[in-house]
Amino acid sequence: MGSDLLSHLSANDRALFWEYGQGAKAFVPFQCAHHAFEFHAKANPDLTAVEEFETKITYKELDRQANCLATRLRGSGVNVGSRVCLLVERSPWLVIGVLGVLKAGAAYIPFDGNVVSDSTLKHAIQDSAPTVILTLRKFQHRVADAASTEIVYLDETLCTSYNPNHCTKPRDFTSSTNSVYIIYTSGTTGTPKGVNVTHGNVTNLLCIAPGNLGMKPGIKVSQMLNISFDFAAWEILGSMVNGATLCLRGKTSKEWKAVMRNVDILFSTPSMLAPHNPADYPNLSTVVVAGEACPKATADLWGARVKFYNACGPTEVTIANTMQLHTPGDIVTIGGPTPNNSVYVLDENMRPVPIGEPGVMWGGGAGITKGYLNLPDKTAERYVPDPFADDGSMMFNTGDLGRWHSNGTLVHLGRIDNQVKIKGFRVELDGVATAMETCPGVQAATALLIDGELWGFATPASLKPEDIKEAALKVQPYYAVPTRYLTLDEFPETANGKTDKRILRQMALDAKNQEEKPANKAPAQNAAWVNLPTTVIAQAAGAQPPTIPHRSSERSLVSTVGSTVVGSQVKQVDSSASSALEKEEYIWSGYLEDEVPEKTQGRIVRNLRHQIFNLYRRLFSVVFIINMALFIWILVTKDYDAHRLGGIVVANVFIGVLMRQEMVINTLFIIFTAVPPSWPLCIRRVCARIYTIGGIHSGAGVSAFVWLVAFTAQATKEMINKGKTSVRTVAITYVILAELLGILIFAYPALRKKMHDTFENTHRYLGWTALALVWIQFMFLTIDYLPEGQTLGQTLVKSPHFWLVIIFTISIIWPWFRLRKVDCRPEVLSNHAVRLWFDYGVTPDAGTFVRLSDAPLKEWHGFASISIPGRTGYSVVVSRAGDWTSKHINDPPTKMWVKGVPTYGVLKLVPMFRRMVLVATGSGIGPCAPAILRRQIPMRVLWTAPNVRETFGDNLCNSILEACPDAVIYDTRKHGKPDMVKLVLRLVKEFDAEAVAIISNQPLTEKVVYGCMSRGIPAFGAIWDS
């Protein structure tokens, strides 16, 4: 039958019809979206699945929460074929909700409770008849009329059990033909229609190239779009089915940009992307746009720096059924059909048009959805059997006009309903916009027919409309060139990020009304234009405001402009938001415009000094170079044997172990931080870096391995040549060498970060085994070289190496002599943090940390101790940052194992300085709290975190504010992620601080320390070497 429909085409066009119109055949590895997610949750359980600034959820935790939610939904009657209305907002709850619904076998219907109109939400609930409405408590008022439907509050169903059997997945009967989600179209031309999309539709795009866009474990993906927009499913489900990390954007432009600077793959509409410069986002590797026509200027600008995909497809063909990797300078097309899909360009009689001729684009293949919910007539009108496939499958009338380009890609020519009649001629408005975009400097353009006149809209506002008109006349006939123009800073956008043509139309009418006043009349035959700034867009939008529900204000703590001496009367800071608080001027107001001090040295010198050869690496180098000098000297003089080389190995192991021994660390910290504030700053800033002694540990460890390799070679040589070294000594040596090699491999920084648990286990278990083997090897070697006339005991007593082995053995074992199981009192601060209180006769000094465990032979975790002046005991703050912490937040312990003694860390240095800025992000306030509470020196505290009081509780927040009333507490949820370097530099200047100390994650710590040190300001932060 398909061949009969092609009989009117030439032989060449018939061949190209099949070549161009059929996507590649590809195997789809997963039939259901949640099956693909579960595969990655099992393969990479500890990888971050969802990231919302400082809040992170691993695949294992997300899978557990989704399983619990699915079980809860099954209990409410949700099963295969059910539908669940998901009324949430952009947050981790969104992703938990999506996966929980899918695991229960149902389809989700997504709406953003902050955006969706009352009429759309009401219609969708009545039309879809969901079994359950899954929402957040804050949106309770939005579903008050849905009394007959069970409402489950997602934020109140968090699973608090750590019992894995409690969170098992319910039986799964889902197949590829079952619905995955239902998207309600915008309804700009009538009542919103629910499009029924299946699992097979979705996995066909998201689980294979090019639709997977290179998403994989370790790749960060943006979530920028309105969750009701089917394009957002590409972000959300795309990242989950490919094992990537989904990064949720906030509400402010700063938060948007912060996420854009943090991800690898960005999804956007062209309108959303237009204001941004790709040079500001060097991290981005892939950008995909869809939803509206992409201006060539945007495609060329971004395509020069990233893999830039222009995609197209209505909701009915599942997100996008065509994609094109754009090459700057080429024509902007929407590409060809994605794998297992097809595209046909047909005339009004549903016959293929000749290649290159315009026609209506129809889609076929695996992406064609089930149809419209409860609208059989509308479905039958737009979905028809595919005569070209002749296999019973359906094809869909997209309503888009297009033509095949000679390179086999599709040129999008706009909508059928976007054609207008001007002076008797049929004009395609998207073609008019494309002609306007040929004018140099035009970033985006669109055209509308308003009251019989053709209007052109372009950005930016600085454009000269006469230039736009001149460029358009070179491409379009006179009747298809706008006679009136509006140039704007940027186009207004709909909730889905598309250009809001309703507002543009109103702006044009307002401008026309102004023109028609007597004083402003212009000759009708001339082109007229108005330049409008961005602020006018908001005014125009306000003329007919969309229905948007009230957004509750978020709580935050702020510090107002002004200075208060530490220790003065405490400011009363209310824990709830107030109107007065909203009007206060923030201490950081305008900080981004501050002029920062110049860096003190040339780029190469300062990078060498502060990044490549920081003090930690310099200490490492000193130890290693000394060893290598000795190594070369011994090789040159040939004054060595296995016994002497073994002694050097022991000496290095001795140094390495002692640099990790708690009592040694504390002694060194006490000595170096005893330098009084009256001493010159140049001395204090060096002594304060005592926390970098880990460089000595690492240098000695690597040197010991090098010497052990030399010892092994020499011992093997002596054994072969019938020398003193015995076979048993050499055999033990090779075992030790293999174990130390394993320890060194997993201690490599990049591998240590990626496989931290493995690093800990190899360091612990191989270290213990190696210690026992070292003793055996040492005894064997001593016997091999036993002098005549001496007993083994006499030789050992006289051997300095024997005493070194004894000392480092005691050093390793000593903390275990102080192992005990103690009581603790949990104080649950939130679902993100718990505070554990201990009182077993130990009151740590400020700046120390303790080691805690619930399985002492398996793992230990270090936490900063918070001691309250005048009280015995201490507390620690445990915040959600992995499985171990999550377990103890969900099920707080009453007993814990402790060992060793509290050990000093970086903040022991605080008393060395006269005035200091102390910086903490999130739970980093824990290590900072003791220094703050003791009020040892005047200090300015900067604490950035989302929802501070809700996360860390009033007690901790109030105690910080009492000790430091001028503390700057920056709510990242409300204000977005700050430029920490600029903000810290402002506080240093205002407070006249001598130094800065920061407790944060590794990237931010290194960034702030470098930002200060390179400008001559002493700055200190933790070293991640263990």
From Swiss-Prot:
Species, as recorded: Coprinopsis cinerea (strain Okayama-7 / 130 / ATCC MYA-4618 / FGSC 9003)
Function: Adenylate-forming reductase, a natural product biosynthesis enzyme that resembles non-ribosomal peptide synthetases, yet serves to modify one substrate, rather than to condense two or more building blocks. The A-domain preferentially accepts L-serine, L-alanine and L-valine as substrates. The natural product of the enzyme is not yet known.
Keywords, alphabetical: ATP-binding, NADP, Nucleotide-binding, Oxidoreductase
Binding site for NADP(+): R685, V686, C687, A688, T769, A770, L771, Y840
Molecular function per GO: ATP binding; oxidoreductase activity
Reductase (R) domain as annotated region, ranges: 682-901
PANTHER family, A to Z: ENZYME, PUTATIVE (AFU_ORTHOLOGUE AFUA_8G01222)-RELATED, TRANSMEMBRANE PROTEIN
Domain remark in the UniProt entry: Contains three distinct domains: an adenylation (A) domain that activates the substrate amino acid which is subsequently covalently linked as a thioester (aminoacyl-S-PCP) to the 4'-phosphopantetheine prosthetic group of the second domain, the peptidyl carrier protein (PCP) domain, as well as a reductase (R) domain of the ferredoxin-NADP reductase (FNR) type.
Gene3D superfamilies: 3.30.300.30, N-terminal domain of ligase-like
Chain residue ranges for the region called Adenylation (A) domain: 37-422
Enzyme class name: oxidoreductase
Protein name: Adenylate-forming reductase 06235
Family recorded in the similarity comment: Belongs to the adenylate-forming reductase family.
EC number: 1.2.1.-
Residue numbers spanned by region Thiolation and peptide carrier (T) domain: 556-638
Binding site residues for AMP: V332, T333, H412, L413, G414, R415
PROSITE patterns (alphabetical): AMP_BINDING (PS00455)
Domain of life, per lineage: Eukaryota
